[in-house]
C-alpha cells in the first residue's frame, strides 16, 4: 500500500512539474515588489478604427495612454466595422513584459458591450507578431491583469478584440492599458 501511495505521489508531482514547464511563459504574480509599471509617457497608439473628433471623451487610441480612466478609445461610432478590432502600442523601447493591465471604458454600471475575448501579441518591428496569449475579458470597471512571458522583450504590444460581449455589437472600447515589466 505504501509503495502504491509513493508511486502515486511521485506520478502526481511529475505531472505537476511537466504541466508547469509547459506554462512557464505565463507567470501569475501577487507580489509586485519585483516588477514596475512601465513609463508610458512617450508611447503612441494607433488602431484599426477610432471615433472621429467631436465625440465625448476623445475616442482616439491615444486615450489608452493618458492615465485618465474617464477617457477611452472607441471604435468609430458612425461606421459599422465588424470584429476583430485592434490597437497597436509603440512602447518606443523593448520591454520585458510580465503583465498587461487593461481597463474597460468606465460607467456607473460596468458596460456590458465591448470585447469578450481578445489576444495579446508582441513585436519588435511592428509587422511580425508573436502571440502572448488569448484571454477572456470580464465586464467590470476594475483594471484586469493578464500575464505574459518576459523571456523575450518587445517594443510593440498589439491588443486584438476577437469577440464581442453581445453578438449584435460591432464596436469595442477601452479606457487604459498599462504594462508591468521586470525591475531594472
Locate the predicted segments by residue.
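Bacterial Sec-dependent N-terminal signal peptides
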Residues: 3-5, 15-44, 49
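Intrinsically disordered, low-complexity regions enriched in Ser/Pro/Gly/Gln/His and often acidic
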Residues: 34-37, 47-49, 64-66, 79, ...
Amino acid at each position: 500500500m505504501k509503495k502504491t501511495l509513493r508511486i502515486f505521489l511521485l506520478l502526481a508531482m511529475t505531472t505537476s512539474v511537466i504541466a508547469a514547464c509547459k506554462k512557464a511563459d505565463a507567470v501569475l504574480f501577487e507580489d509586485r515588489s519585483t516588477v514596475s509599471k512601465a513609463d508610458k509617457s512617450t508611447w503612441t497608439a494607433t488602431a484599426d478604427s477610432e471615433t472621429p473628433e467631436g465625440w465625448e471623451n476623445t475616442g482616439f487610441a491615444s486615450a489608452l495612454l493618458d492615465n485618465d480612466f474617464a477617457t477611452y478609445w472607441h471604435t468609430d461610432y458612425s461606421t459599422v466595422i465588424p470584429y476583430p478590432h485592434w490597437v497597436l502600442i509603440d512602447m518606443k523601447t523593448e520591454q520585458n513584459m510580465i503583465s498587461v493591465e487593461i481597463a474597460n471604458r468606465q460607467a456607473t454600471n460596468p458596460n456590458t458591450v465591448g470585447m469578450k475575448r481578445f489576444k495579446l501579441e508582441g513585436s519588435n518591428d511592428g509587422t511580425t507578431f508573436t502571440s502572448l496569449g488569448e484571454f477572456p475579458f470580464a465586464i467590470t470597471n476594475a483594471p484586469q491583469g493578464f500575464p505574459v512571458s518576459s523571456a523575450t522583450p518587445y517594443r510593440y504590444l498589439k491588443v486584438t478584440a476577437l469577440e464581442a460581449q453581445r453578438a449584435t455589437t460591432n464596436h469595442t472600447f477601452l479606457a487604459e492599458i498599462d504594462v508591468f515589466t521586470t525591475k531594472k
